[in-house]
């Protein structure tokens, strides 16, 4: 624990811990020239092309998602080949740096972050394809039996024998070593590309793409681990004893899939998810026709498509679904996009993904709200409580896992020769049980090189804060109140312009409040908490 805390302190000391905004290359040490008229014309053309590309990409995926068939992205991107050049990025940086209008500068910053992300992704696209192929063909062997590598989690969930679960986990090591070798090549390429674009490191670039800093990400991860610790110990201590017959500190990483399989509840949602969604929107006074909805997607999974928001936002729904959580998640994302006010396209489709994700999670969380489940899914009180408790346990575990992976990745940058050990320290702290050498072998395959976990944590915290505000203003059944819907539409109008931290302050907080997430989860974990500690 002290080792990780020291690393976080070193990160804070090395940077500007007081701010949460992105550190782009020239922000740290301005050496950029003044923009020319040619630069301004190039940026105007870039904005037009980027908007067209994003709309076309969404349309392409919508057609494939709802009609079936493959997506030929390579052919699609061929027509935009001239968009992704360092020369155009440099012109954009000069124009943004000289922009005196804060709103215009913010929009251009979002465009710059998107272009940087695309350039970095293109640098590693070939290696990423090799990784996918490697994982698709990999196998693990145990007692003469060979299994698809991708089936490891289901195998662990179905295996009743703890010793065999450990053997399955150990059998993954040769595959992990092969994956690590390709990952090392990918990291080297990414590091070189990020430095060529002016960033101090690939992780600095990853943080900037989340409109954040490494130091801020490290502090967030540490706060999540600290704030959720007591609740995690209570809940997962109880879960481990009841489902595995062991204390939390005595289980292994290989036992976790089995544990979560035991958390699954037999009661399923009714078939009519669309009816529940429409009823919820009616209660909020939100027009359902703001989003184009098509049911019966061949993929069997829901997905929102912001083709040209706010006018053209679409939602593909499966014909039937055993779990409504993904449906309401995508519905929340679609509603957010469909209510953005006219303005720079960057605020509607670019910007901080965690802001949009927070509203998606807010609606997803309805399917883990016992009162909403009784009202819209027809569950009994016991069934609703069981569903809510299982969902809260998964969210709590996932939050600590994200935080641990972030701490491990940030610490590794400070001492790469200690990567496996640092991963072990971070994840043992997050999980609450020891890791074996086989578990530490996951330190590369499990690494969060792009710091995606930071966005997930920010979204979950902000969603909990939004829910607390809705409950405080409109009662426990806030989804029945048109005034609650009007308030949400006001927030949606900004699109992704505001960061999660800014939006948290707008709704009355001093910033992102991890305790809001803790309170939300404690309130729903009742079935797994001692009676005197249940919220």
Feature roles, as predicted:
Residues 322-341, 357-361:
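Active-site recognition of the HExxH zinc-binding catalytic motif
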Residues 201-209, 250-261, 292-312, 333-353, ...:
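Conserved catalytic-core motifs characterized by acidic clusters
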Residues 17-20:
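Bacterial signal peptide processing site
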Residues 28-35, 39, 61, 65-69, ...:
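C-terminal, non-catalytic "cap/extension" segments appended to globular domains
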Residues 24-178, 184-185, 451, 535:
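N-terminal helix-rich structural modules
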Residues 5-15:
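Bacterial N-terminal signal peptides
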Residues 125-128, 169-321, 525:
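Contiguous, non-catalytic segments that form substrate-binding/exosite surfaces or channel walls
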Residues 221-231, 350-387:
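Post-HExxH zinc-binding segment in Zn-dependent metallohydrolases
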């Amino acid at each position: 624990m002290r080792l990780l805390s020291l690393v976080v302190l070193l990160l804070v000391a090395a940077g500007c811990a007081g701010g949460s905004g992105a550190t782009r290359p020239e922000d740290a040490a301005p050496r950029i020239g003044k923009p020319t008229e040619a630069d301004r014309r190039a940026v105007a053309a870039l904005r037009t092309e980027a908007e067209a590309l994003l709309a076309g990409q969404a349309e392409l995926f919508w057609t494939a998602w709802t009609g079936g068939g493959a997506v030929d992205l390579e052919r699609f991107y061929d027509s935009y080949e001239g968009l992704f050049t360092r020369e155009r990025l440099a012109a954009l940086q000069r124009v943004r740096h000289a922009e005196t209008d804060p709103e215009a500068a913010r929009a251009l910053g979002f465009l710059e972050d998107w272009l940087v992300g695309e350039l970095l992704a293109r640098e590693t696209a070939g290696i990423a394809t090799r990784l996918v192929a490697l994982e698709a063909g990999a196998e693990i062997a145990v007692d003469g039996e060979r299994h698809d590598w991708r089936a490891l989690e289901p195998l662990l969930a179905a295996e009743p024998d703890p010793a065999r679960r450990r053997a399955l986990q150990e059998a993954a090591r040769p595959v992990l070593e092969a994956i690590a070798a390709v990952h090392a090549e990918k990291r080297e390429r990414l590091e070189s590309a990020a430095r060529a674009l002016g960033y101090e490191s690939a992780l600095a670039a990853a943080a900037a793409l989340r409109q954040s800093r490494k130091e801020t990400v490290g502090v967030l991860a540490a706060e999540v681990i600290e704030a959720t610790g007591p609740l995690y110990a209570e809940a997962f201590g109880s879960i481990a004893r009841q489902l595995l017959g062991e204390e939390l500190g005595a289980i292994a990483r290989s036992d976790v899939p089995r544990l979560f399989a035991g958390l699954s509840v037999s009661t399923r949602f009714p078939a009519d998810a669309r009816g529940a969604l429409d009823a919820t929107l009616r209660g909020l006074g939100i027009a359902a026709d703001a989003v184009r909805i098509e049911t019966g997607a061949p993929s069997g999974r829901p997905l929102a498509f912001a083709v040209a928001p706010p006018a053209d936002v679409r939602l593909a729904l499966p014909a039937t679904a055993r779990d409504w959580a993904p449906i309401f998640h995508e519905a929340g994302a679609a509603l957010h996009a469909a209510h953005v006010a006219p303005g720079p396209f960057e605020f509607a489709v670019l910007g901080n993904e965690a802001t949009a994700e927070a509203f998606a999670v807010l609606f997803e969380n309805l399917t883990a709200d016992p009162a909403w489940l009784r009202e819209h899914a027809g569950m009994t009180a016991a069934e609703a409580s069981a569903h809510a408790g299982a969902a809260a346990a998964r969210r709590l575990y996932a939050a600590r896992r994200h935080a641990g992976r972030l701490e491990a990745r940030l610490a590794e940058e400070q001492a790469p020769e200690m990567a496996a050990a640092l991963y072990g320290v971070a994840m043992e702290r997050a999980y609450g049980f020891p890791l074996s050498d086989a578990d530490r072998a996951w330190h590369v395959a499990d690494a969060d090189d792009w710091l995606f976990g930071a966005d997930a944590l920010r979204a979950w915290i902000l969603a909990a804060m939004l829910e607390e505000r809705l409950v405080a203003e409109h009662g426990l059944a806030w989804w029945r109140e048109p005034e609650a819907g009007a308030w949400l539409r006001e927030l949606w109008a900004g699109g992704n312009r505001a960061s999660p931290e800014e939006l948290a302050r707008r709704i009355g907080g001093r910033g992102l409040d991890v305790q809001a997430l803790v309170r939300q989860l404690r309130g729903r974990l009742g079935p797994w908490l001692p009676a005197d500690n249940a919220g």
